[in-house]
């Protein structure tokens, strides 16, 4: 397996799919990166030369926020929303949906498992 930015990219998959294993890179971004570097997107990771791997790593590192850096920025943004006391921050803190979804009957993923009530006889 080729190692790009600390992430194992699978050898048996097309390179544009393999790059999506890196947090912050989707298919479109992967194709853009490969087109900029003039690397065949359907090439397998095991067929990459050391030079191509270093070019990929350098290009991604210079032009994109990925992995830990991206996660830190997202967490920092959420913390900022909580600190300023915005509605979105309060929803994050309470563990409820942030983007206006209804919560009366749904939102189980965000709210967690149901708390069962003890029935009176």
Swiss-Prot record:
RNA-binding found in the keyword field: yes
One of the record's GO cellular component terms: small ribosomal subunit
Residue span of region Disordered: 92-121
PROSITE patterns: RIBOSOMAL_S13_1 (PS00646), RIBOSOMAL_S13_2 (PS50159)
Keywords: Ribonucleoprotein, Ribosomal protein, RNA-binding, rRNA-binding, tRNA-binding
S-adenosyl-L-methionine is among the record's keywords: no
UniProt feature, compositional bias: Basic residues: 101-121
Pfam families referenced in this protein's UniProt entry, alphabetically: Ribosomal_S13
Record-level GO BP terms: translation
One GO MF term: tRNA binding
Family under the similarity heading: Belongs to the universal ribosomal protein uS13 family.
Primary role: Located at the top of the head of the 30S subunit, it contacts several helices of the 16S rRNA. In the 70S ribosome it contacts the 23S rRNA (bridge B1a) and protein L5 of the 50S subunit (bridge B1b), connecting the 2 subunits; these bridges are implicated in subunit movement. Contacts the tRNAs in the A and P-sites.
Family matches, as HAMAP family: Ribosomal_uS13 (MF_01315)
Quaternary structure note: Part of the 30S ribosomal subunit. Forms a loose heterodimer with protein S19. Forms two bridges to the 50S subunit in the 70S ribosome.
Protein name: Small ribosomal subunit protein uS13
Species the sequence originates in: Petrotoga mobilis (strain DSM 10674 / SJ95)
